Amino acid sequence: MRILLINPNRYKFPPVPPIGIEYISCSMEHAGHEVEVLDLCFSDDIYKDIEESINIFKPEIVGLSVRNIDSVLYHNNEFFLEEMRDIVKFLKYNFNLCVIVGGTGLSTNPEGVVDYLGADVGIVGPAEETINILIEDIKNKSLRSSIYHGVLRKDVSCKRKIDAIDYKIYYENGGIAGFETHKGCSSSCPYCIEANKRVFLRDIDHVISEIKDFVSRGYNHFHLCDSEFNEDLDYSIEFCESLKRASLDIKWTAYMKPSEFSKRLLKLMRDTGVYLITLTVDSYRKCTMYWSDVERFVFTAKPLGIKVVIDFLTGFPYEKEEEICENINLLKRLLPDKISVNTYIRLYSSTQITKIIRGDPELKKYLIGNIEDDSLIRPVFYNHITSDDIKKIIGEDPLFIIEGIEKGVNYCRV
């Protein structure tokens, strides 16, 4: 069948290439389908470009990538689904096409997102294998559900169609290429839609091959798309050893958690081109050992010449201001390169923190946003420590930024 894959993500702080579409398109082509990719990120007229692409390619199915449903942060929040919904309406009204949606954004509320967009069906989770099953069901007019759950029954070794995306324009506008070493996350952070998802480790040789492909095209700056690189310490070390043997002249940045690391790993990361690590830290029911791990991480990475930025999420239900102040002062003493503080917790119907807040009527007064909508599709935040409260704690210290007020990501601003 002929499938048109559309990237509707037009957020540019920074622009992020749609890596998922690259994997999916390659998987579908391997299964014998014809695939065309339409990237709308830098489009001047999205509907003109969509119409032109459809008239030339004549697809039978359209796939729409939903990377995020909004920009996640409270300050300067942008809601993305309205424009995506308009695109779906345009596709169905003008061309009567079957529309599939997929991507990380669906995990927030699968049925709710599919219904809001008016799509025919959605895939939740890794779609590299499931997409071809779904296409066959559409072809045979035998859809089993409005939601298909992505499952990888083998090693994550799906190849990637890098040619599908114009990386030159992304690099020219502050974006960089990404790569991933695994899918899923074993952590149980109560605020995260990726928590407790089965982990699939990718074939290391395939990941290195992807990076080599980019380098051969003149691109050598990368960010890691994994939620946290050190999901599996042994695998992370093995990956870095393989990358070091490849002797590639690259630089890259990664997110990590303050556990499952060693000096050996951090040295290997430095030796393979890592210049910046964003350490994800939160204050939800943390013990003394957790804060010791944070300290040990910073004190191990910094002497190796690696910049460390701490992304600190705090202000959870029942946390007192003095506790938050104590934790901020602890992080300040570590002297990382920057500390980004966020006290506005985005709620999703699928997360544990939402269940906790909904279970206590006294917490409802701390909700901000479209609080009458139980689907939580439109942004709703929990906040009882405001940005003004945080400003009083951090003062004018340039070490700190309040997340969201200044748009951008750490590899753009550190």
Regions inferred by a protein language model and the residue ranges of each:
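Acidic, low-complexity intrinsically disordered segments
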Residues: M1-R217, H221
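Short helix-capping segments at alpha-helix termini
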Residues: G32-H33, L91-N96, K244-D249, P303-I306, ...
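Conserved strand-turn element in the central/C-terminal portion of the radical SAM core barrel
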Residues: L40-S43, K257, V281-T288, V298-E323, ...
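Radical SAM [4Fe-4S] cluster-binding motif and immediate context
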Residues: K159-T314, N329
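Short glycine-rich, flexible loops that bind phosphorylated cofactors or substrates
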Residues: I69-V72, I131, E231, K286, ...
